[in-house]
């Protein structure tokens, strides 16, 4: 039998309404009776405890010194997404021209509007929660973990498809100038940039910046030469304006084109011209303070300019029809336009530039996937070994190796036919954009107290989401069969994450099956007075051969702790946190941490916390609830010290609405915001 405990709420008013007394401050005496746990002892998480920690001043000083690391400056960070973002111009203009014909500039202009809308969305969300993960991170802080994992699946698909398609497209551009083996060269590009990714993001960014600046020079010359050629030869543009709209295929049926179909389906194709826009949010932790917003501006502006100018320029240089026209030259459209405008030498230059910048998009995929998977691994959505870094360069070698093997295998399986992966990427990218707009709305509605540098109007969020949904329908109506391939790839990725989410349930089912099919000779033996500790995971006999190995795995998964920072001993908030952890995490160990400054003045608060922890530990026997009091200041250094002391990644540390800390602190601690 436990002791009688006092629980004191934080409010002290007593009201009487209609003769009924309602108490805002109460003392409740509760007799806590600890019943014997049922089932195997290894399933019992153990009794909660109370602990007080003092942070040595030298430890905090060392942490603050070690936190100074090399971060990406404005243009280095811009170049990484800029190659993917601006490189999409190479194929988006031709795709739009095939759908829109003479109205090609209109969908490209509409996409430029989408870019400006999403630039505000990303600026608001990421400055509020500046952690790697992009859409996954935004949804994780506004919804549940399973919903956020859907965005993670789309993100992984997006990067795999981007790397595969970009590598294939790069080799195809180069093959217009020299005869090369397509499959071997594509895999060679994936391998080369995988090795470059192993050198680290700073080294990558320098190479990316050189590629980015060279690409801007080439596109500038091409745009200007197209304008000059159009002025000197105005008949080409006039004749293009007199052509009919291209026919369209809707659900397998060929229909006559119209202005509506040209704009509608062209807009769906043009949305692929802003690919890479979301990548910067997956390595925001590697960027210096204030850089993220500048990367969006620096990448969006030239993409908007070149999309529209080249959309008009090719109509002034090349006829829509004919053997050498726009429709016939869609695989290397800009190279063909360069040949007509300035000659074969410039066509060769454009082809080489296309090869280089599309290869740079592969590098962006490596950087983005490393940031995303590292975050998923620390959040226990993917295996934790993926978050390990090599000592030499500090890069995620397991992620890079796995990404290369996956991308290279797709190149071999598809035999460099990028049609399927283009479709997979289309739905993955547009799905991510739609989910991000939804996350931005939820953040604005549910997390208004979180400080942010930018506040996007509701009209921006709604209009951006509507335009992305329209683009999804345009692609769906154009070729519904692609959705089947996307679903297959999505299911494969989602299955891996489902296994991680339900690995305890799967292991329990496996143990039950082993008891039936392979019982051990100790099936009837049970252990008495066993208490599990994390360091000595010896378990009783389970009644199945190999059962103790399975039981140890379950114990290890459940014993990984989660930390919740709590300012006040609030019954409602703590109960919500426990419910959230049970619904979204595999662990059975929750540590409530309270950081206080003065022991004497906070003595009553600490005692209330201890009582609450004991109460909830009795109420929820399937989860162990510990209370940890820490004397010091609540700041990033304290959080980092606790992370190392308790071996808990910061992404597995939770907090409520952070109204108790400043915007600068919120942006640097990197913890997850939960509860309403």
Provide a role label for each language-model segment.
Residues 66-69, 93-154, 161-189, 299-309:
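Extracellular loop-to-transmembrane helix junctions
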